[in-house]
């Protein structure tokens, strides 16, 4: 009788322990799912751009990339010493430290030197760095967060991503008006042979040498917008675009 009672107790405590372990595993699984779901927040992305006389367009540029969840924008100010400043036009973004201005006012314009500086200083802090001009906007199909794009499995082995330009026409406009660029120039120049573009580069890569504004480091292996490794010279004959 006593032995039978002990067996029942052991069975009861075993089931109780098993239920606790099962509950713990469920909690851990939910935590893992939550972390994976919010993994985008761990990816850090910045934009590096060199600017001169762009005050009419710079705010739209900044807010476009902010809407795409870019974490930081580094603006290399290459305006004339007494030229326009960003104090008013970007006041809120400067105040929040979303935009950082680097003073190159009145200095000789060497865009690649500034790109090199931006990469060397920030490669340890950002997973991806975007080197685009103020008139260059990334537009992704069905995505509003660039981190969702960069986290796609197709880019896991890519050190850099080359995205083709989509050129817009002048829309028969002769004079400036206060509408945004997107509102003023919706029509696209449909040239299927056009394949120029710009590069997004992965951070924390040693030995990067900025040699061209389009490819950045010529020797670096690059992917297209579909994650396929490609040769730039071949792509001149065969357009690759997202």
Language model: regions and residue ranges:
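Active-site-proximal specificity loops/subdomain of glycosyltransferases
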Residues: 86-128
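Short beta-strand-to-loop acidic/aromatic patch adjacent to the donor-nucleotide binding site
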Residues: 126-139
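N-terminal signal-anchor transmembrane helix specifying type II single-pass membrane topology
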Residues: 8-37
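Catalytic-site signature of metal-activated, phosphate-bearing donor transferases
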Residues: 111-116, 140-242
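Short beta-strand/loop segment that forms part of the nucleotide-sugar
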Residues: 71-80, 103-105
């Amino acid at each position: 009788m006593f032995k039978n009672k002990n067996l029942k107790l052991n069975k009861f405590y075993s089931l109780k322990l098993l239920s606790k372990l099962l509950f713990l595993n469920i909690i851990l699984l939910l935590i893992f799912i939550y972390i994976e779901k919010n993994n985008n927040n761990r990816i850090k992305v910045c934009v590096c751009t060199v600017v001169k006389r762009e005050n009419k367009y710079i705010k739209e540029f900044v807010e476009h990339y902010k809407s795409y969840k870019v974490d930081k924008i580094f603006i290399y100010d290459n305006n004339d010493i007494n030229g326009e400043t960003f104090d008013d036009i970007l006041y809120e973004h400067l105040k929040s430290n979303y935009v950082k201005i680097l003073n190159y006012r009145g200095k000789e314009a060497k865009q690649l030197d500034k790109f090199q500086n931006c990469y060397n200083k920030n490669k340890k802090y950002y997973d991806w760095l975007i080197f685009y001009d103020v008139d260059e906007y990334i537009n992704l199909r069905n995505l509003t967060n660039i981190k969702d794009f960069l986290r796609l499995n197709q880019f896991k082995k890519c050190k850099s991503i080359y995205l083709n330009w989509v050129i817009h026409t002048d829309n028969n406009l002769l004079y400036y008006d206060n509408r945004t660029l997107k509102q003023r120039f919706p029509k696209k120049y449909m040239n299927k042979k056009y394949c120029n573009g710009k590069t997004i580069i992965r951070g924390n890569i040693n030995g990067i040498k900025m040699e061209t504004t389009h490819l950045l480091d010529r020797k670096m292996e690059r992917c297209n917008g579909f994650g396929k490794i490609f040769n730039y010279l071949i792509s001149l004959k065969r357009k690759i675009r997202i």
